[in-house]
Amino acid sequence: SLLAVSMIFTMMSTTVVHAQSVKDGSNEVTVTPNVGVSYVSPEETIETRGTSRPSKVWNIKSKGQYDFAGSSHYQNLYTNYKFTGKTSYKVYVENTGDNPITVTAKRLTKTYGSTKISAGKTGSFEFSNIKSDTEFYIVFEGNGYSFSGHVK
């Protein structure tokens, strides 16, 4: 019956195990739940309806500081929002992992600020070369990394 088939699929789906291994001999990644970040760049996201890019924007002037945290084995992570509202910003990141990460504030064609943060250290950068209505996002790059922080 349909119920039996769906139960079999449900039981089978719970036995699937996804394993990722790091082959360069580095320490295992500290798994931090992704909060406010994902593997999808705001510049690459396409709406399923309509022809314009999504307008998912966080106005820091009106909504305040945006917090984020995440971890990845090797893929870049991006903030879920583009940011706007001010003419100067500060990005603060704590590297909670065992490998260095590079944090960059940018839009598709321009980089506003960037820093490389060693394992277990904190880092920040500020930039003011931006108009209050210009949108930017933050990208996190590295191998086997985890972090938490905010932009304000």
Regions found by a protein language model. Give the residues of each.
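Asparagine-centered strand-capping/turn motif at beta-strand->loop junctions
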Residues: V93-G97, F140-G142
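Short beta-strands within extracellular/lumenal beta-sheet-rich domains
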Residues: Q65-T84, S146
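N-terminal prepro-regions of secreted/extracellular proteins
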Residues: S1-A69
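Exposed beta-strand and adjacent loop surfaces of beta-rich binding modules
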Residues: S88-K90, D98-T102, E135, S146-S148
